[in-house]
């Protein structure tokens, strides 16, 4: 299969992966309305083409939390990467490191902190959930600090798991799930050989290290299901802020008031995110939520965004809507499942090229020049109502 665009990786991954794994990463909550809107709303953001601007000295470089990034992109936290490629977290981290951008290790990674951190030169970021087992949280933070992780991404939009109906149909959960997964695995030989056999162990490394015993997929589902904490409040985060002496980012913000609370709390950054449409179906897409949040806190806190970003044009759109940097999720996982480290490296090259084209044709020589003035209404379709204020005065 020829890979000429970032979107090609999704189709390639679907051919390689057992259905339970493909649909686990590809699916969302309930009827998947928000999952669809994440992509569709972002694609409806029209860019403003400008010409004859002498774009010979264009640069994608930016700085975030005193880290230099080759472009305003980081690989976001995605669980179970090691089920999609052999030691997947290590491969993805190496690709990000080579490209000069951060990699974020998920709490529920297959490869533990101690395996991933030494594999790269750049300090990685670490993502942590709010869990009932505070002992695990403290243990994970201590290990992340010891491994030299620079930034903590604290995910707060998961006090309870979302209802993901597609998982029951695909075999990730539901009746006879283990047998269904086995049958799917043996009928997908490329994955079975490369990952299923040679990618072992398939423990959840960070959890296994704490529990002191191997943890497989069933353990992962059961342990997490029993450990999400619906009682969490801002007050519960205070000990983490005191313990962690590096930048702390609150992930899962969709409302301007929550963004203001993050500023008052003393967070260094927020991620405007609906968990990729995997938690509460029917909430705003990140693209719709971002402008109002940027209007409320831009300049007071670093604004990151995820959910729906599939290519370099989407990165430019998110920045024009108010983000400082974006996180990739499914986009890099599709590439990882298709071709491992080389796939992620190629995806990042594609995104960089697409960003350069978009910036050249919108007259933005640097990331700081991508603003609301880079957006335009019209071209046969108005921007969604929640996005229109960002393009005020730019009607074509």
From Swiss-Prot:
It catalyses: (S)-lactate + A = pyruvate + AH2. SUPFAM superfamilies: FMN-linked oxidoreductases (SSF51395). GO terms for biological process: aerobic respiration; lactate metabolic process. It is found in: Cell inner membrane. It comes from the Bacteria. Residues 1-380 form the FMN hydroxy acid dehydrogenase domain. Keywords: Cell inner membrane, Cell membrane, Flavoprotein, FMN, Membrane, Oxidoreductase. Its EC number is 1.1.-.-. The active site is at residue 275. Substrate binds at residues 24, 129, 164, 278. One of its GO terms (molecular function) is FMN binding. PANTHER family: L-LACTATE DEHYDROGENASE, S -2-HYDROXY-ACID OXIDASE-RELATED. HAMAP family: L_lact_dehydr. NCBIfam families: L_lactate_LldD, PRK11197.1. Belongs to the FMN-dependent alpha-hydroxy acid dehydrogenase family. Catalyzes the conversion of L-lactate to pyruvate. Is coupled to the respiratory chain. This is L-lactate dehydrogenase. The lineage of its organism: Bacteria, Pseudomonadati, Pseudomonadota, Gammaproteobacteria, Enterobacterales. The gene is lldD.
């Amino acid at each position: 299969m020829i890979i000429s665009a970032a979107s090609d990786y999704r189709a390639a991954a679907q051919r390689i992966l057992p259905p339970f794994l493909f649909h686990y990463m590809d699916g969302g909550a309930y009827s998947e309305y928000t999952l669809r809107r994440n992509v569709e709303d972002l694609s409806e953001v029209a860019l403003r083409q400008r010409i004859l601007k002498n774009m010979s000295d264009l640069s994608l470089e930016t700085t975030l939390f005193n880290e230099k990034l080759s472009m305003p992109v980081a690989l976001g936290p995605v669980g179970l990467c090691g089920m999609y490629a052999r030691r997947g977290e290590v491969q993805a981290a190496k690709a990000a490191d080579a490209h000069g951008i951060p990699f974020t290790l998920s709490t529920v990674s297959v490869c533990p902190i101690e395996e991933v951190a030494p594999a790269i030169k750049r300090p990685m970021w670490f993502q942590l959930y709010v869990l009932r087992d505070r002992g695990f949280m403290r243990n994970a933070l201590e290990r992340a600090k010891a491994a030299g992780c620079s930034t903590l991404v604290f995910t707060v939009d998961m006090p309870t798991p979302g209802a993901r109906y597609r998982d029951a149909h695909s075999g990730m959960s539901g009746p006879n799930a283990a047998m269904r997964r086995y049958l799917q695995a043996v009928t997908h030989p490329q994955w079975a050989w490369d990952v299923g056999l040679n990618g072992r162990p398939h423990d959840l490394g960070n959890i296994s290290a704490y529990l002191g015993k191997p943890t497989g997929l069933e353990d992962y589902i059961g342990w997490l299901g029993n450990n999400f904490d619906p009682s969490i409040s801002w007050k519960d985060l205070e000990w983490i802020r005191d313990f962690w002496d590096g930048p702390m980012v609150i992930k899962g913000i969709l409302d301007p008031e929550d963004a203001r609370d993050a500023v008052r709390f003393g967070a260094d950054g927020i991620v405007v995110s609906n968990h990729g449409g995997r938690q509460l179906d029917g909430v705003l897409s990140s693209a719709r939520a971002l402008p109002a949040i940027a209007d409320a806190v831009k300049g007071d806190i670093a604004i990151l965004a995820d959910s729906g970003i599939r290519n370099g044009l989407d990165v430019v759109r998110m920045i024009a809507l108010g983000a400082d940097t974006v996180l990739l999720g499914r986009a890099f996982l599709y590439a990882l499942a298709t071709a491992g480290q080389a796939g992620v490296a190629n995806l990042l090259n594609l995104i960089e090229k697409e960003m350069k084209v978009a910036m050249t044709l919108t007259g933005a020589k640097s990331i700081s020049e991508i603003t609301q003035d880079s957006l335009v209404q019209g071209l046969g379709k108005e921007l969604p109502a929640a996005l229109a204020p960002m393009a005020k005065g730019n009607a074509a």
